[in-house]
Amino acid sequence: MVGVKTQGEDILEYGRGYSEDVDIIREREYPQLKDTTYLDHAGTTLYAKSLIEAFSRDLTSNLFGNPHSMSASSQLSTRRVDDVRLRALRFFKADPDDFDLVFVANATAAIKLVADAMRDSRQGFWYGYHVDAHTSLVGARELAAKGNRCFSSDEEVEGWIQSLREAGPESLNLFAYPAQSNLNGRRLPLSWCETIRRRSEAAGGNTYTLLDAASLVSTSPLDLSDAAAAPDFTVLSFYKIFGFPDLGALIVRKSAGHIFEQRRFFGGGTVDMVLTREMQWHAKKQSSIHDRLEDGTLPFHSIIALDSAFATHRRLFGSMENVSSHTRFLAKRLYDKLAALKHSNGERVCQLYTNPFSDYNKAASQGPIIAFNLRNSHGAWIGKSEVERLATVKNIQFRSGSLCNPGGTSGSLGWTGADLLQQFSAGLRCGDDHDVMDGRPTGVLRLSLGAMTNLADINTVIQFVEEFYVERAAAVESLITPVPSIPVQQPRFYIESLSVYPIKSCGAFRVPDGKRWEIRREGLAWDREWCLVHQGTGATLNQKKYPRMALIRPFVDLDRNVLRITCGELTSSDQQVLEVSLDREDTNLVSTSICQRSSKSSTVCGDQVVVQAYSSPSVSRFFSEFLGVPCTLARFPPQSSSRFSPPKRPSGAWKQYLRKFVMPGSFPQDSSPSSAPERNPILLSNESPILLISRSSVNYLNENIKANQKKKKRAEGSSSSRAVAADVFRANIVVAESFTQLPRVESPYVEDHWESLKIGPEHLQLDVLGACQRCSMVCIDQFTGVRRDEPFSTLAKTRKINGKIVFGRHASLASSEVTRDEHDTTERWTLMVGDTVTPSYTHEE
């Protein structure tokens, strides 16, 4: 492919040198990309279909034995490994007379191999690393007995290089840095390796260089043809180039190979002789560096797969130079479009993190990676987790967080070490949802491109940001529905439905009409008292990861005192059934007599809790076979409750937001919060004992969904255009309006103004705690287990406050009811479908 033109723009670099048009290659070779935008190539790129097919043919056509044997099959494996090793060196233009290549698991394993060898030297070593280093490079500092230093800038590095003339031969030094930052794609000078060597040798010093090339080689050629200018040690991961196999390499400049002579550990295949009885002695292999370092049996099947990877990559893309040109063009286009996005008030949407000297037009200074965060029109940060959740719903995949680049991330975001220690004490952890702390983001969003990225990927991301995060003046008015005046007649509302979710994240048990249901401090009776836990990790399973959990439907049979559980679609004729006792002490039933429980620590929404796990193989098999994951049932009884919901949320933020859209004076000034806000006990619920939603709000949301679909002119009958059922919100209580006169005008989102509710003939009081933050789990159809993009997509446009998508309200028994209940143990509060609901509003005295 020579080049194409699109929209009048000459883009000769797009797919230049490829075997065919990029879109044709994608359709044939990357079926896993169908309906998906994948922009996390810095993590791993994707493997081609023909690569897997070629490797499969290789495996089924040849007999490969363990390379450490002398059989014909073993010798075939040895020959193939040797051939692939040479091919890998040539891929990086490394002369085998000057370099050796050691196969390892990944780049991190290669770094550790070098650091371990230097640690084992008699005098130890000093270690220096660049602030943009990957976490694995930073970790090597712990092995440096002579000290270490983090260079916070290129200027510091170059100043240190100048001082190498004063270094003596007694000092063993290692300087490590990334060829390309995995955070933002900034490329560092490869010339440092040659300069360091020249100055160190001139002073009789002993300084070596380690280049982390893992990020660079994913889309760019690495030329090691000049051995005098090359790093002493180069580390990389092949899966970042080809997607498969999962394999890494350490390329050693042979003149630096003596560093490994003091290495203490030895494994099978790296020695010529070992004595173990009369004396302890061994002789290391001397034939090559890789013979001394590749401990144990090589992953020879993966190495053989690498042969197919080289061939497939060359056939499809021609060369790494072609990939570099292709991705450079797309990265420049993406960067320019993101940088140009503005809100209606002129404020920029994207905060882009780049080096001042980087240029997306120049391969020497910048790779195809873009790091950024989003702001709203008022300059407030939009949480990275919220963006990633919505992107997942839209089938867009990228990475967020600190990206295993602690120095680069903290520097870009303005965090000092003292700041981060303070935030760590406050609960900040790698991979958590603490998106913004002390007014600053804790991580970034990263888009990274690969050989098979196309223009459609770029356009999809831009359209995604424009649709959901660019604020336009015309759209603001529809963001919040004005609250109608509250009519005098009461009641206006009633309980339309009551739902209990006995097993966390599984299907609902709908309380029958006419049945009064007990409500406790922890919520509705039997609600979220059980959960499914992974038998390996102890983590609680949820529908976000396992959508089929929606098809696990518990039934609370009070007459028989059992929880009856069925699996499968409602229309299925072969549903499986399991019963467990509701009574923890009841062992009379056969189904529970074998359900012995053992205490097991589990993680629920970040909390460590102790649950009682059913150890019966039949229970585990029932759930494991249906979900396809090793799990079992566990219980968290009310009497052992040790979890608490967050304190009642101050409503000020929500009120301030609403003030922009309703009449002045609708709300009084916020009162001062209590110094010790009450916290409600919960079982396995996420945040509160009770979750309620409004039928009117669901109806209004569906109107918005339909309007959005018409606006986009989507094909009629597509799954995404259907109205959503109230069930997707997994509420305990659905409140509906009762109309006594015409016209019937609903009041959507009136629940945003509720302070408390009085329910039923006994006026049971519930306190409304705050808005319920939503995630992509609402996109799972609770009747089929199928994931869609609604209602989350529409909620993201119409129900967002401070970057959080909300729908429904958290609630709990009022403290007065709890106190009364504790003093009179014979009285139990109950609810029933049809009970009247009388709300009090935040602006009522």
Curated annotation (Swiss-Prot):
Family: Belongs to the class-V pyridoxal-phosphate-dependent aminotransferase family. MOCOS subfamily.
Protein name: Molybdenum cofactor sulfurase
Pathway(s) it belongs to: Cofactor biosynthesis; molybdopterin biosynthesis
Gene Ontology biological process terms, A to Z: Mo-molybdopterin cofactor biosynthetic process
Keyword vocabulary terms for this entry: Molybdenum cofactor biosynthesis, Pyridoxal phosphate, Transferase
E.C. designation(s): 2.8.1.9
Recorded superkingdom: Eukaryota
Name of the gene this protein is made from: hxB
Cofactor(s) in the UniProt record: pyridoxal 5'-phosphate
InterPro entries, alphabetized: Aminotrans_V_dom, MoCF_Sase_C, MoCo_sulfurase, MOCOS_middle, PyrdxlP-dep_Trfase, PyrdxlP-dep_Trfase_major, PyrdxlP-dep_Trfase_small
UniProt keyword Ribonucleoprotein present: no
Transferase recorded as keyword: yes
Lineage of producing organism: Eukaryota, Fungi, Dikarya, Ascomycota, Pezizomycotina
